[in-house]
């Protein structure tokens, strides 16, 4: 079983760059305080790095 990480959206996506909003959607985040559990892959890490200022990560 691969490693998973929990990602929580902490800030709103209103007024953000369209690419960053799409990254949040790609991660499965819809609203503030929404948490999803994702596999720890390079693709997921790349999306998290783009929106690091709007999310909180728990390993």
UniProtKB/Swiss-Prot annotation:
Keyword hit for Ribonucleoprotein: yes
Protein keywords: Ribonucleoprotein, Ribosomal protein
One CC-aspect GO term: cytosolic large ribosomal subunit
SUPFAM superfamilies associated with the record: Ribosomal protein L30p/L7e
Entry GO MF terms: structural constituent of ribosome
Keyword presence, Ribosomal protein: yes
GO terms of biological process kind: translation
Assigned protein family: Belongs to the universal ribosomal protein uL30 family.
Subunit structure: Part of the 50S ribosomal subunit.
Protein name (Swiss-Prot/TrEMBL): Large ribosomal subunit protein uL30
Species the sequence originates in: Aliivibrio salmonicida (strain LFI1238) (Vibrio salmonicida (strain LFI1238))
Taxon lineage: Bacteria, Pseudomonadati, Pseudomonadota, Gammaproteobacteria, Vibrionales
């Amino acid at each position: 079983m691969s490693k998973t990480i929990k990602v929580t959206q902490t800030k709103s996506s209103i007024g953000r760059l369209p690419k960053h909003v799409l990254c949040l959607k790609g991660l499965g985040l819809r609203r503030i305080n929404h948490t999803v559990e994702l596999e720890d892959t390079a693709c997921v890490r790349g999306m998290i790095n783009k929106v690091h200022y709007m999310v909180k990560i728990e390993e």
